[in-house]
Amino acid sequence: MEENRDVKNEELEKEEIADEVAEKDNETQESNDAAETNEASKEASENIEAAEEDQEDLVKNQEEENKKLREELDATKDRLLRLTAEYDNYRKRTAKEKEGIYSDAYVDVLKEIVPILDNLERAVAADGSIEDLKKGIEMTIKGCKDSFAKLGVEEIDATGEFDPNLHNAVMHIEDEELGKNVVAEVFQKGYKKDDKIIRHTMVKVAN
């Protein structure tokens, strides 16, 4: 009887020990789980903080880049405004200079024409014979040609082959002696200055 009681006591002690071991294992597991959870939470928190720092750096860099772009845009606008103003001043200045050149050219031409007008007025006002009048006109023509020479105006050559760039054909004739496309007669003289045609020579052309 007493022996059975001892056996039961031993079994109870073993069960208690097993329960204690199991409880300790559970506590250890819970402690490990808690540690792992804390570690994971800590790592997640660190990752969040790092992501927030990266986001802040990105925003800061973007703001700096935007500021730099705005400054460059403002500088470009300023340069554009200055260039526009400079071009406008240049355009006005060149227009004024061009107007001055034209005005000077007109004056130079008129200086040569006025003496011709003087000669014509004197010829009309003079009391003389037809010969005197003719002589006065001839002098006026000479003065006109001299003025043309000073202005660089030349008479267009109308001899030889017809040139549509220089001549204006107002009549055509058949003349085997002259040959084809040759100026047969000049009706009105033409003039040029350098490569500019003042007036084409009016001619008759042989076909």
Swiss-Prot record:
Subcellular location(s) per record: Cytoplasm
UniProt keyword Chaperone, yes or no: yes
Function text: Participates actively in the response to hyperosmotic and heat shock by preventing the aggregation of stress-denatured proteins, in association with DnaK and GrpE. It is the nucleotide exchange factor for DnaK and may function as a thermosensor. Unfolded proteins bind initially to DnaJ; upon interaction with the DnaJ-bound protein, DnaK hydrolyzes its bound ATP, resulting in the formation of a stable complex. GrpE releases ADP from DnaK; ATP binding to DnaK triggers the release of the substrate protein, thus completing the reaction cycle.
Organism this protein belongs to: Clostridium beijerinckii (strain ATCC 51743 / NCIMB 8052)
Gene3D superfamilies: 3.90.20.20, Head domain of nucleotide exchange factor GrpE
GO-annotated biological processes: protein folding
Taxonomic lineage: Bacteria, Bacillati, Bacillota, Clostridia, Eubacteriales
Alphabetized GO MF terms: adenyl-nucleotide exchange factor activity; protein homodimerization activity; protein-folding chaperone binding; unfolded protein binding
HAMAP family according to UniProt: GrpE (MF_01151)
Residue ranges of coiled coil: none
InterPro entries referenced in this protein's UniProt entry, alphabetically: GrpE (IPR000740), GrpE_coiled_coil (IPR013805), GrpE_head (IPR009012)
Keyword Chaperone attributed: yes
Keywords for this protein: Chaperone, Cytoplasm, Stress response
Disordered: annotated segments: 1-66
Assigned GO CC terms: cytoplasm
Main localisation: cytoplasm
Subunit structure and binding partners: Homodimer.
Pfam family, any one: GrpE
Superkingdom of origin organism: Bacteria
The protein's name: Protein GrpE
Compositionally skewed regions (Basic and acidic residues) per UniProt: 1-11, 57-66
Protein family according to the UniProt entry: Belongs to the GrpE family.
